[in-house]
Amino acid sequence: MSEEITNGAAAPVDAATGPAFTVEKIYVKDVSFESPNAPTIFNDQVQPELQLNLNQQVQRLGENAFEVVLAVTLTCQAGERTAYVAEVKQAGVFGLVGLDPQSIDVLLGTQCPNILFPYVRQLISDLIQAGGFPPFFLQPINFEGLYAETLRQRQEQGDAPSLADSEPAGNA
């Protein structure tokens, strides 16, 4: 018995075969680049200061499907002036079948952003270079550590809802 797999996609997983974690789709949800002081900013000899903001959002799409969005904003200041602002929202749809809520929460908080991060890194670097600035490479992020910190904060607040507890999206 054989299963046909087309164009490199994973074969559908039957819930009866056991737990499964699948990447259904990866896509850019939003992208923006602004350089409000170009072209005069290119002549500045000021050491730039960078500020990185990272955010993750999870939305349940169905019983076994979740959208995870990894949002990154990188702001570069040259003295009092903004050199650029690069924003990327990289998203993925992930299938999680036959897993307990705690395992789902861990996967949504660690593995999903780890899968999306290389796409974010590449997009940020490409945007900045296309804007006429030297490349910037986002350094690896310890999503496991961030998840552990989030979990600790949730416990301090009295069991706030997990990532897997969100309601399915759609028309109500």
UniProtKB/Swiss-Prot annotation:
An individual GO BP term: protein transport
Report keywords, A-Z. Chaperone, Cytoplasm, Protein transport, Translocation, Transport
Pull one GO CC term from this UniProt entry: cytoplasm
GO MF terms, alphabetically ordered? unfolded protein binding
Q: Name the Gene3D superfamilies for this protein.
A: SecB-like
Q: Which InterPro entries match?
A: SecB (IPR003708), SecB-like_sf (IPR035958)
Chief location: cytoplasm
Task: Give the subcellular location.
Answer: Cytoplasm
Give the highest taxon in the source lineage.
Bacteria
Q: Which family does it belong to?
A: Belongs to the SecB family.
NCBIfam families linked:
PRK05751.1-2, PRK05751.1-3, PRK05751.1-4, secB
Physiological role:
One of the proteins required for the normal export of preproteins out of the cell cytoplasm. It is a molecular chaperone that binds to a subset of precursor proteins, maintaining them in a translocation-competent state. It also specifically binds to its receptor SecA.
**Entry's PANTHER family?**
PROTEIN-EXPORT PROTEIN SECB, PTHR36918
Describe the subunit structure.
Homotetramer, a dimer of dimers. One homotetramer interacts with 1 SecA dimer.
- List the protein's name: Protein-export protein SecB
Instruction: List the source organism.
Output: Stenotrophomonas maltophilia (strain K279a)
Output the lineage of the source organism.
Bacteria, Pseudomonadati, Pseudomonadota, Gammaproteobacteria, Lysobacterales
